[in-house]
Amino acid sequence: SGSKTAKIGDGCFGVPIDHIGSTTDLGCGRPRPKPTPRGS
């Protein structure tokens, strides 16, 4: 329920979880919000 495009694992699924509103553990096996790009 937010306009933030979080990515699951940032490399496992990488899909917008707009319909959920929170990062789920669908791909990596654990919830992981997308951190700020700091030289990634």
Curated annotation (Swiss-Prot):
What residues does the annotated propeptide cover? 1-8
Basic residues: bias regions: 31-40
The entry's note on the tissues where this protein occurs is: Expressed by the venom gland.
Q: Name one Pfam family in it.
A: ANP
Matches recorded under InterPro entries: Natr_peptide (IPR000663)
Q: Where in the cell is it found?
A: Secreted
Which BP terms does GO give this entry?
Answer: regulation of blood pressure; vasodilation
Would the keyword Disulfide bond turn up in this protein's UniProt record?
yes
Please report any disulfide bonds recorded for this protein chain, giving both cysteine positions.
Answer: C12-C28
Q: Name one GO molecular function term.
A: hormone activity
Q: Which GO terms describe its cellular component?
A: extracellular region
Q: Where is this region: Disordered?
A: 1-40
Give UniProt keywords alphabetically.
Answer: Disulfide bond, Hypotensive agent, Secreted, Toxin, Vasoactive, Vasodilator
Biological role: Snake venom natriuretic peptide that targets both NPR1 and NPR2. Exhibits hypotensive and vasodepressor activities.
| Family of this protein | Belongs to the natriuretic peptide family.
What is the protein name stated in its UniProt record?
A: Natriuretic peptide HsNP-b
Lineage of producing organism: Eukaryota, Metazoa, Chordata, Craniata, Vertebrata
